[in-house]
Amino acid sequence: MLERFHVPEDVAVRVKQQNVRSTIEGIFTKMGMSDSDAVQATDVLIWADLRGIESHGISNMMRRYVEWFQNGEINPNPKWEIIREAAAVCTIDSDKGHGLVVGPEAMNVAIERAEKYGIGSVSVTNGSHFGAAGYHAALALEHNMIGLAMTTGGVTVAPTHGSEKLVGLNPLAIAVPTMNEPPFIFDASMSSVAGNKIALAKRLGVDALPGWVADSDGTPIMEEKPVPDDYIILPLGGTREVGSHKGYSLAVMIEILSSVLSAGGAGANRRGGLASHHFLAYKIDAFTDVDQFKKDMDEYM
């Protein structure tokens, strides 16, 4: 996490993990979730906070989750189901279930199918925000698998050279096991800056860096200044000169795999739920020797 996003020490309040855990679990159950689902949802938020991903942690997300519960955009007791499948792949209708709960469930389905077929691929439609993508991808590590997780973020990004919000933030994560080194985990949105970091910047009163956002007509803001109210987030890369077409195209790729593939539409024409997701699990020993793979990863790291 960049230093500008840290809460100033003079106003920071530190609490024991167990204390905050019980509080957040209590909020989730108050919203109607089962005890077990509340525990799972809290796990994802604490995982993010402990790794410095404050944009997807408790303080930045809980207010929004409560709002989404209250306005019906998150169903506290979903009856998610597999609506289409073929061997190693399937599509799940999340029934607007909380992504912090249905996300791990879907990733585990991908892992189960990878155990049987060598690879597992699961699309989720009619879903909601699933927190830090890295949490879901990392579930594959203990199974000697490579995990990928991606999701459709808010449609707040302009295409390269564009002046309208037509593209999702669309984060992607990959988790790769190693032998002795820490696992390789990459987790990032395909925008110049995560949307939740913009919300965090506005909450903390800190400036946006050059190339993060554009003004209302799509002109990139190339000086450090406060985030304007009518901002548009730029694709990863910021401007065409430094590669924003790559970030834009990666965001489109994730939109296709997560939303279009699960019959959820795309961009401003999405339908059903707050988000769609896609999860992949690769069983390493279906491709190569696991120990050799991990040794090679150690050397690479």
For each predicted feature, which ranges?
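Acidic, glycine/proline-rich low-complexity segments that act as flexible tails and inter-domain linkers
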Residues: M1-Q17, R21-A41, I58-E73, D207-L209, ...
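A generic, well-ordered mixed alpha/beta core segment in the N-terminal half of proteins
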Residues: V89-M179
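Catalytic-core signal marking the mid-to-C-terminal active-site face
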Residues: L2-T23, I256, G267-M301
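Phosphate/diphosphate-binding glycine-rich loops and adjacent basic-rich segments that engage nucleotide
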Residues: V157-P228
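Flexible, glycine/charged-enriched surface loops at secondary-structure junctions
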Residues: M33-Q40, S55-I58, A263-A275
